[in-house]
Amino acid sequence: MYPVSEAFLQAVQGNTRKYYWSGKITTAGGVVHSFDQEDIVKGSGYITAQCCGNSEIELGAVYAAEMGISLFLDIDRYTLEDAEVELSYHLRLASGAYETVPMGIFEVSEANRTVHVLELKAYDRMLRFDRAFNGFETIGTAYGMMALCSTACGVELAQTQAEIEALPNGSELLSIYPENDIETYRDVLYFTAQVLGGFFCINRAGKLEFRQYGETPVMEILQKHRFSSSFSDFVTRYTAVSSTNLRTQTSEYYALETDDGLTMNLGVNPLLQFGLEETRAELCGNILDALSKVNYVPFDSDTIGNPALDLGDVLTFSGGQADDQQITCVTSFTVKIGGRQSLKCVGKNPRLSQAKSKSDKNISGLLNQIEAGKIGIHTFTNASEYSIGETDVRIISIEFASKEENHTQFFGQVVVDVAADPAARSANA
């Protein structure tokens, strides 16, 4: 949660509130266009962000936040290329003073103009990391990887080297395996966040920030603060991770002592390929320790809104159908300017951990088709020659076993070196 005063937290949960939004647009040339609540087309503004997909908790997320807004401003849209938009939320406290919460810095990607309205769509600085990466010989700690991406893409880091090195695997020396699918600096951040056991996002100051999933609630959302809500009847929790070792072409499995939850598949992480087996086990064990804090109830709720909430914040819900003994986490949110705030936490059911999804079944079917189309030819030659005389001698013997249905054909070839015994014959003509 963005640091705010206790007076702000009390005011934002009150039955009524007085607030307004403001912002400014800074062009690439340094020209500043300020706007306030009256310049915003009612119902047009929104901010949406996420740290997971639409179905399950993820490690290594590097999602970009999106902002859209329509303004009654007379600005030439062609001057807004590479412009930045800053938004702020101002809430009146009980004392009568206003407290300001920055809502982020976004870079304009689209600017459309109608007769009276300027329509903007913008994304945060995460998109800057979509630049080609060619440092395949890179070696360093997680902070070194972050600093490399930060310098190359022009985005400041929110944390110091000491803060990153204090994290799980933060002080380990990492190296990029030559055989990898890294294309951009964003891919490097993805794999680095996996090793650290969390995700990256751009914070409200426009800096790259690493966050982990926690277990300490930052606030409670009461029933009177919710317009609608739905809660799952299960708790998402992870008790194992699996990682593919490219050198041995095997999937390595690491689990807690009681392994009865979901398994996080790390796939082929090029930063987890080098080192001894014990080193890989330690790295994956630290990732599992960070992941084991995930003990969340998936939910979806429309609330009166608290603009100070951030991705990764742990919440509790009470009242109605909510279980106040369980915790949950904000994995995505949408803030409507002048409207509601939608909060969501995704997660899979541990009871279905062994079940295959439709996509998994389709992939398995395709792999089976590929395997079915393979033709294998194996040639065997006897180690030594056989001498054949008047008695029967077995010269070909094949023992065959298959783990699946196959069509098999056997062909035998006997190369004979015949030596005839000379015999004297006579005949009369």
Annotate the PLM regions.
Residues 1-23, 27-29, 120-122, 131, ...:
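Acidic, low-complexity/disordered segments
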Residues 1-139, 176-182, 187-197, 202-204, ...:
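Assembly/oligomerization scaffold segments
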Residues 35-62, 258-294:
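Short beta-strand/loop turn elements enriched in aromatics
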Residues 52-55, 106, 312, 393-397:
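Short structured motifs
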Residues 56, 95-98, 112-235, 263-265, ...:
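Charged- and aromatic-enriched interaction segments used to assemble
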Residues 149, 408, 426-429:
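Short, intrinsically disordered, charge-balanced linker/junction segments flanking boundaries
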Residues 368, 388-402:
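Short beta-strands within extracellular/lumenal beta-sheet-rich domains
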Residues 401-411:
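Extended extracellular/luminal ectodomain segments enriched in beta-structured repeat modules
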